[in-house]
Amino acid sequence: GAVQDYDRGVIVGTQTFGKGTVQRVDQLSSGQIKFTESKFYRVTGSSTQNMGVLPDINLPTAMNLDKFGESELPKALKHDKIPTSKYRNFSRIEKIKPELKSLNSNRIDASIFYNYLEEIKTWRKSQESEWINLSLTERKKQKERIETELLALENSLRSKLNLPTFTDYQSFLERDEDPDELNIKKKEIKETANILIDIMEISKAPLIALNKTG
């Protein structure tokens, strides 16, 4: 969060899990007890508790992040604020963030892979239910349906990328390491590099002017 507060860079990725507290563990005769004894805050006065750090530029993920983090705990401390501290803002990035977001959005919208991640995320949400069928026959049918749907999503992506597809779900599970086209970590690194290039390109004219006058 300090990178954002001092305007020294761009946070790229997904929202963090929202832990902004400090715990102490004391020993008991038959176990341990954990106390939450303090909270920490950013120089802006905002806590990361329950909210985490929000990225400047979101990258799609197949995970439903609402299900993770301290905010999901029933008695987690709430997000709050304290008075802002005195600090120096470097004013380097904030003014170009709208353009960075626009350029990133255009690439994400055109990306077959990132559209696939959104499809997987939507599919996972559609599978959420508070009910569990206790019938073994129905459970087997449900398992087969899930495997069929996941295989169809995977093969659809691979077809669009001109990659080999799978004939059945088992061969999909036993596949070798995914190629670069399907490696989410490498995709994220590549997009982050693209954002860095955008920053350099957008900032190029002022930097050249500075060099000429210097």
Could you tell me what each predicted segment is?
Residues 1-82:
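Conserved acidic, small-residue-rich alpha-beta core segments centered on
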Residues 48-212:
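Conserved functional hotspot residues or short segments at active or partner-binding sites
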